[in-house]
Regions:
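Short alpha-helix
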Residues: 178-198
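A conserved beta-strand element that flanks and buttresses the S-adenosyl-L-methionine
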Residues: 124
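A C-terminal cap/extension of S-adenosyl-L-methionine-dependent methyltransferases
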Residues: 199-254
Length: 254
C-alpha cells in the first residue's frame, strides 16, 4: 500500500467500500435519466472490448468484468481484477462460478500496481478513476499498459454546477475523497493517451427524473426526446458537452 497522506486516503476509501455506501435510492432516482445512454454505452463497450480478446487485461475494480467481459463473450488470455476493498472483491467473485472467464482477483492499491511495466494490452474500469489520486493512477495505468494498448473508463463529470449541488446534498452515496472529473483531469488524460470521449446525460437528467414520476418504463417518449436532444446538443454545441453527467473514455497509449 502507498505511504503518507495518500495511504490515509486509500484507507478511507477501503473502509467506505467495506462498510458499503447507501446508493440504492440515489440510483433509483436517476434510473430514467441514464437508461438510454447506458444502452449506448453497452454498445460502445462491446465494440471496444473486442480488442481485449485473447489479450492480457486489467480491470481497476472487481465488479464490471461480468457485464463488460463475460456478457460480451470476451475471453482474455488473462484477466486481473484489483480492488482495495475485500467486500468489493467478494461481490465480484459471486458470478465467477458460473463464468467461462476466470478472473484473478487481487486485493491491491491502484496507486501502486504490483505488475511489471508493459504488462497489459487493455486496462478498463467503471466509476473508479474519480476515487483515486488521478495523476498517480494515470501514471500507473500508463506504466503497466503496453505501447499502443487500450483504455476504457466510464466516469462522472463534476463541471455542471447543478451536479455539484446534487453531490453536496447526497454525501451518503459517495466517499469523502472521490472527485468527479473536471477540465484538468480531461486535459491530463490527453498527455498520455489518444482519446475519444462519449458524453452522457444533460437534459436527460431533469427530463428523466420527471419521466420517472409519470412512467414506469424508463424507455418512454420523454426519455427518448431527452436522449436525442442531448445527442444533438453534443454535436452542435461542443462546449455544452462538459456539462453532461458522465463521460465514457476510449483511449490508446501514446
Amino acid at each position: 500500500m502507498t505511504e503518507g497522506p495518500l495511504s490515509a486516503r486509500v484507507q478511507r476509501e477501503q473502509d467506505a467500500f467495506n462498510d458499503g455506501l447507501q446508493r440504492d435510492g440515489y440510483m433509483r432516482l436517476f434510473e430514467h435519466t441514464s437508461h438510454l445512454f447506458l444502452q449506448r454505452r453497452a454498445r460502445i463497450v462491446q465494440n471496444e472490448l473486442k480488442h481485449a480478446q485473447d489479450k492480457n487485461v486489467l480491470e481497476l475494480g472487481s465488479i464490471s468484468w461480468k457485464s463488460w467481459i463475460e456478457d460480451n463473450g470476451i475471453k482474455p488470455r488473462n484477466l486481473y481484477c484489483i480492488n482495495i476493498s475485500q467486500e468489493e472483491i467478494n461481490l465480484g467473485k459471486e458470478s465467477e462460478h458460473l463464468s467461462k472467464v476466470k478472473p484473478h482477483f487481487i486485493l491491491m492499491d491502484a496507486h501502486n500496481l504490483d505488475f511489471e511495466d508493459d504488462s497489459f494490452d487493455f486496462v478498463y474500469g467503471c466509476a473508479i478513476l474519480h476515487h483515486l489520486d488521478y495523476s498517480r493512477a494515470l501514471d500507473e495505468i500508463y506504466r503497466v499498459l503496453k505501447p499502443g494498448g487500450k483504455i476504457l473508463f466510464a466516469e462522472p463529470l463534476g463541471i455542471n454546477p447543478i451536479a455539484k449541488l446534487v453531490r453536496v446534498m447526497t454525501p451518503f452515496a459517495r466517499t469523502i475523497d472521490e472527485k468527479p472529473l473536471m477540465f484538468k483531469e480531461l486535459l491530463e488524460l490527453e498527455k498520455k493517451f489518444n482519446t475519444s470521449h462519449y458524453y452522457e446525460e444533460f437534459l436527460s437528467v431533469p427530463l428523466g427524473v420527471i419521466s420517472g414520476i409519470f412512467f414506469n418504463n424508463p424507455n418512454n417518449w420523454l426519455t427518448r426526446l431527452a436522449f436525442n436532444l442531448d445527442l444533438s446538443l453534443n454535436r452542435m454545441f461542443p462546449f455544452l458537452r462538459y456539462l453532461f453527467r458522465h463521460v465514457l473514455i476510449v483511449g490508446t497509449r501514446k
